[in-house]
Amino acid sequence: MSYLIVGASSGLGRELAYVFAGKGNSIIISSRDAKDLDAIKSDITNKFKNVSVQTLPADLNSPEDFINNLKIKGKGFSDIEGAIFPVGGMFDEDGIYLENDKVEKILKINFSSITLIISELSKAFNDNGKGLVIGFGSVSGLLGRKFNSHYAASKRALESYFESLAASQSNDKIKIQFYILGYLETNLSFGKNLKLPKGSPKKLAELVYKKKNINFKKIYFPFWWGLIAFLLKIIPINFLIKLIKNSKS
């Protein structure tokens, strides 16, 4: 049985690949870049002997192709024990008036393609009587914003979807988990002047592995974002909208 890790070529996805393989688990690692995947596979198999690593070069902009290729790798999904989606994509110019084709790409990568893949996998998990699905949102989705508007909206939609996914499970052996992420030490945040400290992808990957068998829970990382989320919920929305209008981000 294998764990599917989508977006495994860098950042959190890469760290998850190393953590899960380091614990002796077989993994299927996926991203758009076949060369990056091959390099990671070679390094992991050198570090951790007798661990199976398969690569799945695929693009979430083509979810049907992704699913068909995954069926081949995962023997019709019957060989997949869990699916982890540390993926996300955005455009620097993302705002309400972003071009339609870019909006479509943002929604696919951050939301709709993920739900299509999970829908297919869920059938296999129900047949097997067990499974694991882990999704990752963003603190960007806590509140509407002038910039990264569609990215934030898609991450909020994904959070709602995972709540529905958890509510739909009648088998407690199918675990659904969702992490809401603040800033991490990745290439996406490199060089940015951020007001809050960045979290470690490696520490997060270790936390994900440690908590993979718990029942549904939304986990904020770094943890202090949970307090910020609580405060945003109790502040009147009209006041928050005024702040957003007057802000530069």
Residues covered by each model-derived region:
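Conserved glycine-rich cofactor-binding loop
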Residues: 9-10
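Conserved glycine-rich Rossmann-like NAD(P)H-binding loop of the short-chain dehydrogenase/reductase
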Residues: 23-40
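Rossmann-fold cofactor-recognition segment
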Residues: 47-64
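Conserved mid-core segment of classical short-chain dehydrogenase/reductases
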Residues: 67, 75, 82, 88-104, ...
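Residue(s) in the substrate-gating loop at a strand-loop-helix junction
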Residues: 138
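C-terminal helical subdomain
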Residues: 178-179, 193-230
